[in-house]
């Protein structure tokens, strides 16, 4: 549902942020 979608989006943003930080 909405919760899992939000979690997936948050995960993608986190991965992108980590890549940019490196």
Swiss-Prot record:
Q: Where in the cell is it found?
A: Secreted
| Modification sites for Leucine amide | 22
Q: Which residues form the signal peptide?
A: none
Biological-process GO terms, alphabetical: defense response to bacterium; defense response to fungus; killing of cells of another organism
Keyword Secreted tagged: yes
Q: What is this protein called?
A: Peptide PGLa-B1
| Family per record | Belongs to the gastrin/cholecystokinin family. Magainin subfamily.
The record's keywords, sorted A to Z, are:
Amidation, Antibiotic, Antimicrobial, Fungicide, Secreted
* Principal cellular location given in the protein's record: secreted
Q: What is the lineage of its organism?
A: Eukaryota, Metazoa, Chordata, Craniata, Vertebrata
Record carries keyword Secreted:
yes
What function does this protein fulfil? Has antibacterial and antifungal activity.
Query: What is known about the tissue distribution of this protein?
Result: Expressed by the skin glands.
CC per GO annotation: extracellular region
């Amino acid at each position: 549902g909405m919760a899992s979608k939000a979690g997936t989006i948050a995960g993608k943003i986190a991965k992108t942020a980590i890549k940019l930080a490196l």
